[in-house]
Amino acid sequence: MLKYGGTKLSTKTANNLISVSIDLCRDYTQIAYCMGNMAEPDSVSTIAGEQKYLIPTEIGKLNNSDEWCIGDDALLREKNGEAILADDILKTILSEKSIVVSNNTYTGYEILKHFFEGLFKILKSNYHIVQPDYISVTVEYPDRILVNLIRNVLNDMGYDREHVKIIGHSESIIYYMISQKKEIWVNDVLIFDFTKHQFLVRLLTTVRAREPQPIVVEEMDMTQKFKVSDLQTEQGRLEMDTKFLELLKKLCSKHIVSAVFLTGVGFYEKWMEDSIRFLCSKRRVFQGYNLFV
């Protein structure tokens, strides 16, 4: 049995099953949920009734207390002097170093468990979802250390391992793409992921000479050339538009591209002009935060 809004529902009925997806990234985390009778998942807002879907991947410990806070709440409390933040938690976890908060030392497992508890608290308070049946977690790269930590955390929170799936962004994109209309991926597909920390280009190609036809993902890291910090000035935004246009022309000269996806906070800085005009010529272009969740 599971609880939804305080009402017990049978997990044996497909329409009552609740799946929760979590996209855990270095800069932001997102959550979505889906019930069996929903056509597609709904993104979870951190503020009820608003469209606030990005949760900063930040965690803090309240001063003189055992309580923890996450996301914007942690940032606000740290600003007000009410909490101390852990520094860049995913990067530190992957380095297998201990994490120091308020002069206390914590393991990556402990910090990640507090963060996930904060995420599920949002689900419970804003959406009345108490215990989902299935959980999928997407991460930028399915590093063994991080994957094992996530599995252990969720298992200790009461979620059976067989009901938890953890995949990387590249695999997640394939699942997402094949769920779309075939006209979108009839040719190659480009995905640009522009976050605070990286600029990744992924090219999805369907190998039509083989049966069944596999989808191959080629990944290019162009972080050194495209940085969010370069968008702080008007000149930087103009130069970014020019560089991105050059990259697009180069890629589209080598590949027949039927669709382009733009995701990440970097694409919401309103710097694309010539580049977006080029993109939208004879191609389907999609922009959004929740490509991986």
Regions found by a protein language model. Name each.
Residues 14-15, 105, 129-132, 184-187:
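Short helix-loop-beta connector
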Residues 127, 142-145, 149-161, 174-202, ...:
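ATP/nucleotide-binding catalytic cores
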Residues 135-147, 251-279, 283-289:
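Glycine-rich phosphate-binding loops at beta-strand->alpha-helix junctions
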Residues 174, 187-190, 194-200, 204-230, ...:
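Internal metal/ion-chelating core segments
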